[in-house]
Amino acid sequence: MFKLLIPNKYNYVIRPLVRFKSIKSPKSPKPKPTAKLSPNVFSSGKFSQLHNDTSTTNIESKITSFDQLKIFPSVREAMIKEIKSQYNLKGPRHSNIDEIDIKPTPVQIAAIRKINQTRKLKVPNKDLEGMDDAERIQFELQNANEIQKTKVFTVAAETGSGKTWSYLAPLLSKLKSDDMEFWKSDPEGYDNTRKKGQFVKSVILLPTNELVDQVYETLQRANSFELDHKGAPGNFTSFLELPENKTMNITTMKLGQGEAPVRLFRQLETKGPIDVLITTPGKIVAFSKLVNINRPFRVFANVKYCVLDEADTLFDDSFEKNTTDVITHFPKLLDLILVSATIPKVFEKKLSKLFPDQRSLIRVATPSLHKVPRNIKVMTIDADVAPYNGSKPRCLAQALYAISKDGTEPGYVKRIIVFVNEKSEVDGIVESMITKYKVRPEDIVGVSGSVNIRDRKDMLQPFLQPAELIENDDFGSKVKILVTTDLLARGLNFQGVKNVILLGLPRNSVDLVHRLGRTGRMNQNGRVFVIVDKKSKKSWVKGLGNAIIRGLRIG
């Protein structure tokens, strides 16, 4: 695939960082419900943009199964089937997906427990019958207020930790529980509403169309599995035996780029209520321009649950107004769930401004927040030394060649993601690799914001699905290379991608965490190669790999 560029003596000049033995610390006492975050690296200066003063959530190690968590039975079964369907079976350890025991991740344990907590107040020591009229009325009013007030959850966990199902599991459980309670109290009303209701029950907001597609496809897969409901508690049986509940039976819809909002109203008219709408804030704000539809925002009057995925982005300067405007159209909102892999300092300040009473925030933060998983190996390449002599493209070409010949992922097409800082660099790098370094045009694509959404989707497909066998690839590719910017560094699940190259350093620590997080997802191994020169060489770069091994936070 590649022309050999460098004499043999220079082959594989990618130098792994020196690994220093970490100093053993004395045994620590039993952890308390909250723990102070561990030290972090480069936590000062302009590069440092992450907030690291949040306490973490204590996560009980006794929970080792989704069966131990409060999840609606059909949601649990569909979720496990969906996770297994996306599991990477490469390697000798497992030959059959049924051998895989799917366990909840720390963020899934913590978020599901917090979000699914009962809203009802505990009855005081003396029961309701033992209260006088004044006490009973006061308790019932307080209970009603607790049930109806909006709760705000923040869910923060490291990249690749399973955050999508950490909010989907409680969200879908609440939707199904609401349906079951409605059916038990009024079967006829439930059936009529299911067929004719014209409203949206919940909304998931995301910053990019790629993420809208990703979450929508996750829900579509989960909704496609036939369920047997084995082991479901008796109080669920009659509801689960309804004909429509042979699957999870969640109605979903997405509004992405090029999809007119009027589609939502057509679907409501023909198919009834939508359980989950997945879209961007701008799409809902655009409803105000629908002059041919009477009171278009009326369909959101019954929204009870809203998720802001990649919440730090949705509250940055370019999204904040649209995001807050959208939320104001949900008058019956019960749960607002803010999800992110990073808590930037700017985002934390905005949270404090939006919710000055910090008691109104229910925080979930895993101990590994802002840490890069230890299964990611970071290596630096100095473009200033021979044979590169200051040429970062030459350095990149040699790195691509070395990866293609290293003997890993035998039989499969290797996927490599290359990050640059400016979208203006993308096309130039792709052109250089093809014309000067003889990379096949079929093996490399460049994706930036200037590429239309339909083409972007096609170009990204090989990276968003499990690796193909070389013999099955349409172009006979042994590697596929994606050159892109931070546009694609957030949230996207590049399935099983083992190699990421940073062509220079990102602007800040937030972007660094997200770029590193495109590999090593869900406990799989990954490698990151950081190409630096005299302009981008920082003293801490050579210590980054050691910081990861030691479990330090990115500052």
Swiss-Prot record:
Pfam family, one: DEAD
Subcellular location: Mitochondrion
Motif (Q motif): 101-108
Enzyme class label: hydrolase
Signal peptide location: none
Extent of motif DEAD box: 309-312
Keyword hit for Zinc: no
A GO molecular-function annotation: RNA binding
Record's GO cellular component terms: mitochondrion; nucleolus
Entry annotated with the keyword Lyase: no
InterPro entries xref list: DEAD/DEAH_box_helicase_dom, Helicase_ATP-bd, Helicase_C-like, P-loop_NTPase
Example of a GO biological process term: maturation of LSU-rRNA from tricistronic rRNA transcript (SSU-rRNA, 5.8S rRNA, LSU-rRNA)
Catalytic activity reported: ATP + H2O = ADP + phosphate + H(+)
Binding residues for ATP: A157, E158, T159, G160, S161, G162, K163, T164
EC number: 3.6.4.13
Superkingdom assignment: Eukaryota
Domain Helicase ATP-binding: residue ranges: 144-361
Keywords annotated in UniProt: ATP-binding, Helicase, Hydrolase, Mitochondrion, Nucleotide-binding, RNA-binding, Transit peptide
Residue span, Helicase C-terminal domain: 395-555
Interval spanned by the transit peptide: 1-25
Family membership: Belongs to the DEAD box helicase family. MRH4 subfamily.
Domain comment, as recorded: The Q motif is unique to and characteristic of the DEAD box family of RNA helicases and controls ATP binding and hydrolysis.
Primary role: ATP-binding RNA helicase involved in mitochondrial RNA metabolism. Required for maintenance of mitochondrial DNA.
Name listed for the protein in its UniProt record: ATP-dependent RNA helicase MRH4, mitochondrial
Source organism of this protein record: Candida albicans (strain SC5314 / ATCC MYA-2876)
